[in-house]
From Swiss-Prot:
Organism: Human parainfluenza 1 virus (strain Washington/1957)
Primary subcellular site in the record, as a coarse category: virion
Enzyme class per UniProt: hydrolase
UniProt topology in membrane: Single-pass type II membrane protein
EC number: 3.2.1.18
Family: Belongs to the paramyxoviruses hemagglutinin-neuraminidase family.
GO MF entry, a single one: host cell surface receptor binding
Pfam family, one: HN
Self-association and partners: Homotetramer; composed of disulfide-linked homodimers. Interacts with F protein trimer.
The protein's name in its UniProt record: Hemagglutinin-neuraminidase
One cellular component (GO) term of this entry: host cell plasma membrane
Cell membrane found in the keyword field: no
Length: 575
C-alpha cells in the first residue's frame, strides 16, 4: 500500500511538478505571447463570423430593396407612359385647333383684311394723287426701276474718255446681242402691227404700237397697245426690255399716230382719233379729235378726249397728228412733237439748198412745203404741250415750229438728254438726208441741225436716197436716229439702205460724213418699214435697242421686231 501510496504520491507529485512546469511556462514571455495569439485568433474568428452574418443579412435586405426598386421603376414607367400619352393628346388637339384657325385665317380672314387694307391704301393714294403738289409722291408708290447702273444714254456723259478722244470704231463689226423680245403682236394671220413708239425714262420705259386687224391701211380698225416696263439684265449681262403691265385700248376708238412718254412711274400717250382718211382731213378746217392716255404700273388708266375747240392753237390747222416718235417731260408739262397742215400758210423762208441745183431759188423751197396731195396745205411741225398733265383736265397748247428753222413738217420725235433737247424729223420732202439736231424751245424757237451727208432714206423716184435738190414731193420713211455725241454728229440708227424701195434694214453707226460700222439684218431683199432706235448706258457701257417693222413675207404683214447692239465706241490715244 505504502508503495501504492508512494506511487500515487509520486504520480501527483509528478503531476504537480508538470503543472508547476506549465505555470512556470505561462509566466514566461513566450507563454504570454501564445496566450494573446490564441485570444486574437479566437476574436478574429468570432468577428469574421459576425461579419459574415451581417453580410448575409445585408444581402438579403439588398435583394429585397432591389425588388422594391424594380417595382417602383416599373410603376414610374407606367406613369411616364400615361403622362406622355396625355401630353401628346393635348398637343395633338392644340395643333389641330390652331391649324384649323390658321387655315381659316389664310383662306378667309387674311385675304379679307388684306383686300380691305389694299382698298383703303389705294383710295388714300388716289385721293392724294388728285392733288398736283403730291404728284411726285404718288409716282413713287410702286418700286419698279431699271437695273442698277442703267439709264438713258446722255451724249454729254457718254461721249468722253478718261484718256484720249472718243470715236466710233469699225473693228470689230457690230453684231446682234442675244435676249428675249416681248413686243406685242397680232393674233390674226392678216393682222398688221404698225408705228412702234418707244420712250425710255429714268425709271421705266413706255412702248406703244398699233394693231390693225385686217391689212396695214392707216385708216383700218385697230387696237392700240401701251406697255410699261423696266430694263433688266439677262444672264449674259445684256439689257432686256422687261414688260410689267400692258393695256389694250378699245378698237372702236381707233387710235392712230400715237406718241409716248415715260415719266416717273407712268406712261403717257397722245393719239389721233381720225374718222376720215388723211387727204379728206387736210381738206377740212379743224383737226380730228385727240386723246391723251395715262397708264400706271398698277394697270389703272385714265383718258382725256379733246376736240378742236378744246385746244389752244397759235395758228388754225386743217389737220394735225402726233408724230409717232417719243416726247419729253419738262417740269409739269409734257411736250409731244406733232405735224400737220395750216389752214393759212405762214410767211417766211424755209430751210433751203440752192447750190449745185439748176433753176432753184428760195421760192421753190417755200412752195415745196405746200403739198398738192394734201390740198396744198403748208405742212409744218408743232410742239403739243400738255400743261399740268396730272390735273383733272390738262390743257393742250399747240405751238408751231417756225418754217425758217425747219424742212417739210413730218413725223418725228423729241429727246431730252441731260439739259439738251434733240429733235428728229422724217425726211419726207426733197431733203433726203438725216434730219437730227438740237432744239431750243425758248422764244424764238430755233433748231441747230447736224450736217449729215451720208445717211438718208429710200423715197419715190423724184425724192430718192440721193436727191439733194428742192422740189415738191412727199415720200421717205420714218427711221429715227439717236445722238451719241452732244452735237448729234455721231449717231446710231437703223436705215433702209436702198434707193427707192423699203428694203434692206441695216443698223448703222455713223458720223456726218462716214458710215463707220454697220450690220445688215438679213439681206437686201428683206422688206421693212418704220424703225426706231433708243440707247442706254450700263455703268458707262453703251447699248442700243433697234425696233424694226419687218415684213413677214409669207403672211404679207408687218410686225415690229427688237434687236440689240453694243455701241462700238473707243477712246483713241494720239501720240
Amino acid at each position: 500500500m505504502a508503495e501504492k501510496g508512494k506511487t500515487n504520491s509520486s504520480y501527483w507529485s509528478t503531476t504537480r511538478n508538470d503543472n508547476s512546469t506549465v505555470n512556470t511556462y505561462i509566466d514566461t514571455p513566450a507563454g504570454k505571447t501564445h496566450i494573446w495569439l490564441l485570444i486574437a485568433t479566437t476574436m478574429h474568428t468570432i468577428l469574421s463570423f459576425i461579419i459574415m452574418i451581417l453580410c448575409i443579412d445585408l444581402i438579403i435586405k439588398q435583394d429585397t430593396c432591389m425588388k422594391t426598386n424594380i417595382m417602383t421603376v416599373s410603376s414610374m414607367n407606367e406613369s411616364a407612359k400615361t403622362i406622355k400619352e396625355t401630353i401628346t393628346e393635348l398637343i395633338r388637339q392644340e395643333v389641330i385647333s390652331r391649324t384649323i384657325n390658321i387655315q381659316s385665317s389664310v383662306q378667309s380672314g387674311i385675304p379679307i383684311l388684306l383686300n380691305k387694307q389694299s382698298r383703303d391704301l389705294t383710295q388714300l393714294i388716289e385721293k392724294s394723287c388728285n392733288r398736283q403738289e403730291l404728284a411726285q409722291i404718288c409716282e413713287n408708290t410702286i418700286a419698279i426701276h431699271h437695273a442698277d447702273g442703267i439709264s438713258p444714254l446722255d451724249p454729254h456723259d457718254f461721249w468722253r474718255c478718261p484718256v484720249g478722244e472718243p470715236l466710233l470704231s469699225n473693228n470689230p463689226n457690230i453684231s446682234l446681242l442675244p435676249g428675249p423680245s416681248l413686243l406685242s403682236g397680232s393674233t390674226t394671220i392678216s393682222g398688221c402691227v404698225r408705228l412702234p413708239s418707244l420712250s425710255i425714262g429714268d425709271a421705266i420705259y413706255a412702248y406703244s404700237s398699233n394693231l390693225i386687224t385686217q391689212g396695214c391701211a392707216d385708216i383700218g380698225k385697230s387696237y392700240q397697245v401701251l406697255q410699261l416696263g423696266y430694263i433688266s439684265l439677262n444672264s449674259d449681262m445684256y439689257p432686256d426690255l422687261k414688260p410689267v403691265i400692258s393695256h389694250t385700248y378699245d378698237i372702236n376708238d381707233n387710235r392712230k399716230s400715237c406718241s409716248v412718254i415715260a415719266a416717273g412711274t407712268r406712261g403717257y400717250q397722245l393719239c389721233s382719233l381720225p374718222t376720215v382718211n388723211e387727204t379728206t382731213d387736210y381738206s377740212s378746217e379743224g383737226i380730228e379729235d385727240l386723246v391723251f392716255d395715262i397708264l400706271d404700273l398698277k394697270g389703272k388708266t385714265k383718258s382725256h378726249r379733246y376736240k378742236n375747240e378744246d385746244i389752244t392753237f397759235d395758228h388754225p390747222f386743217s389737220a394735225m397728228y402726233p408724230s409717232v416718235g417719243s416726247g419729253i417731260k419738262i417740269e409739269n408739262t409734257l411736250i409731244f412733237l406733232g405735224y400737220g397742215g395750216l389752214t393759212t400758210p405762214l410767211q417766211g423762208d424755209t430751210k433751203c439748198v440752192t447750190n449745185r441745183c439748176a433753176n432753184v431759188n428760195q421760192s421753190v423751197c417755200n412752195d415745196a412745203l405746200k403739198i398738192t396731195w394734201l390740198k396744198k396745205r403748208q405742212v409744218v411741225n408743232v410742239l403739243i404741250r400738255i400743261n399740268n398733265y396730272l390735273s383733272d383736265r390738262p390743257k393742250i397748247v399747240v405751238e408751231t415750229i417756225p418754217i425758217t428753222q425747219n424742212y417739210l413738217g413730218a413725223e418725228g420725235r423729241l429727246l431730252k438728254l441731260g439739259k439738251k433737247i434733240y429733235i428728229y424729223t422724217r425726211s419726207s420732202g426733197w431733203h433726203s438726208h438725216l434730219q437730227i439736231g438740237s432744239l431750243d424751245i425758248n422764244n424764238p424757237m430755233t433748231i441747230k441741225w447736224a450736217p449729215h451727208e451720208v445717211l438718208s432714206r429710200p423715197g419715190n423716184q423724184d425724192c430718192n436716197w440721193y436727191n439733194r435738190c428742192p422740189r415738191e414731193c412727199i415720200s421717205g420713211v420714218y427711221t429715227d436716229a439717236y445722238p451719241l455725241s452732244p452735237d448729234a454728229v455721231n449717231v446710231a440708227t437703223t436705215t433702209l439702205y436702198a434707193n427707192t424701195s423699203r428694203v434692206n434694214p441695216t443698223i448703222m453707226y455713223s458720223n456726218t460724213s462716214e458710215i463707220i460700222n454697220m450690220l445688215r439684218l438679213k439681206n437686201v431683199q428683206l422688206e421693212a418699214a418704220y424703225t426706231t432706235t433708243s440707247c442706254i448706258t450700263h455703268f458707262g457701257k453703251g447699248y442700243c435697242f433697234h425696233i424694226v417693222e419687218i415684213n413677214q413675207t409669207s403672211l404679207n404683214t408687218l410686225q415690229p421686231m427688237l434687236f440689240k447692239t453694243s455701241i462700238p465706241k473707243i477712246c483713241k490715244i494720239t501720240s
